[in-house]
Design a protein with these regions (language model features):
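Pyridoxal 5′-phosphate
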Residues: 1-128
Length: 128
């Protein structure tokens, strides 16, 4: 998959000279993503992996097909490598907890002095 995302793909930048540097907290979405989300909410909004009715099945299919699309986009070996979380903090916590049995006494966890607090505490906890 070849992709070239440009600033012009993001509607938020259309009307003002915005410089946005807080993507770790909330990332801006390109128009294609906004349009796809809007369409999903309008036509397939239901619980994913829980509903046995048609609308729920469609919602689950869209959810899982997005995993495939993302897997292709990031060149993952498998869509099973793509995990959805509520945000970066949850992702970091999930990663650090998943490494708990792999980390051994004497191993080093390296962080820069510029890390956000949410990327320090999970590693401090793991180091204990």
């Amino acid at each position: 998959m070849t992709s070239l995302i440009q600033k012009t793909d993001f509607p938020i930048f259309d009307d003002e000279k915005l410089i946005y540097l807080d993507s770790a907290s909330t990332s801006q979405k390109p128009k294609i993503v906004l349009d796809t989300i809007k369409k999903a909410y309008e036509s397939s909004n239901a619980n994913v992996h829980r509903a046995l009715y048609d609308l729920g099945s469609r919602s689950t299919e869209l959810y899982e097909s997005s995993r495939e699309t993302i897997s292709d986009f990031i060149n993952a070996h498998s869509s099973k490598e793509v995990i959805f979380t509520g945000g970066a903090t949850e992702s970091i916590n999930l990663l650090s907890y998943s490494l708990e049995k792999k980390i051994q006494r004497g191993d080093e966890i390296l962080l820069s002095h510029m890390e956000h607090h949410a990327n320090i505490v999970p590693w401090q906890q793991l180091a204990k």
